[in-house]
Amino acid sequence: MSTREGRLKDTSIRLSEATAADFFALLKPRVMALAVFTAFVGLMVAPGAVNPVIAVIAIAAIAIGAGAAGALNMWYDADIDALMSRTSKRPVPSGRVTPGEALGFGLVLSALSVMTLGVLVGWLAASLLAFTIFFYIVIYTMWLKRSTPQNIVIGGAAGALPPVIGWAAATGAVGVESLVLFLIIFLWTPPHFWALALFKVGDYAAAGIPMMPNVAGPASTRRQILAYALLLAPVGVLPWAFGFTSGYYGIASAALGVGFIWHSWKVRAASETELKPAKALFAYSIVYLFAVFAALLADTIAMRALMSVGA
């Protein structure tokens, strides 16, 4: 019996010595935090007033759904996680949580999040959340991740949907504005993860994951990172260009985009053995996304405050 067959057959919910911290780690809290923040911004910048109780329920349900996706991802990827130094100490490959526990935990949280969002907030948002979990687990984790170097490009759609879900929770619809936010995250995802792959290329090779540096080579990956940065920077300004925000957001987003291009250019110009620029881009990319969405939120709050004063 192969490792994969053994892992997939071990779906019994048997007790382990897992702690609450181990189950919390299954949620991928850092990834969850990004999803929750972008969903929160999507909800807050949507037009119209949102009942605070509904807003809290929506964000909580989205957080639970994001955590559920993380738990299911760790269940399925336990075999390859065990082969990579970056992930070998995760709860399932380390043996602290059994595969059955991770699977059951993820499925229960998935159902809880979708039903809560549907019953208490709206079924469009719930449907989008269900699709996001399905896409991340079935399309990305089970299929794309192990089969194509475009795994992150296509699979990035799942990570880009939270602001759309937040917008739908607030309005009951999907607006052009929310699709712009989707596009920002979608274009941000490849350079973010390819930068990581450049300095973790050995890990991905050991696990047999066809990340771009392992398949196309570091030089091609560096060129593609710069290409995506050149696309991302102007797209990041679209909320202002389309009139969704004031010029203050446009200036902030443009400056952040220039920084992204600059870091990407340094990666493009670096030698194959020089990893510092890739590490710097990876760190900056996280700052970029949080800062762009924070600027969007701050700009929206400020504009509404000024409008209320002038009313």
UniProtKB/Swiss-Prot annotation:
It is found in: Cell inner membrane. GO terms for biological process: heme O biosynthetic process. Keywords: Cell inner membrane, Cell membrane, Heme biosynthesis, Membrane, Transferase, Transmembrane, Transmembrane helix. The keyword Lyase does not apply. The chain crosses the membrane at residues 31-51, 52-72, 97-117, 119-139, 152-172, 179-199, 225-245, 247-267, 281-301. Its main location: membrane. It is an enzyme of class 2 (transferase). GO terms for cellular component: plasma membrane. Pathway: Porphyrin-containing compound metabolism; heme O biosynthesis; heme O from protoheme: step 1/1. It comes from the Bacteria. It catalyses: heme b + (2E,6E)-farnesyl diphosphate + H2O = Fe(II)-heme o + diphosphate. GO terms for molecular function: protoheme IX farnesyltransferase activity. Its EC number is 2.5.1.141. Pfam families: UbiA. It is a multi-pass membrane protein. NCBIfam families: cyoE_ctaB, PRK04375.1-2. Belongs to the UbiA prenyltransferase family. Protoheme IX farnesyltransferase subfamily. Converts heme B (protoheme IX) to heme O by substitution of the vinyl group on carbon 2 of heme B porphyrin ring with a hydroxyethyl farnesyl side group. Carbon 2 of the heme B porphyrin ring is defined according to the Fischer nomenclature. HAMAP family: CyoE_CtaB (MF_00154). This is Protoheme IX farnesyltransferase 1.
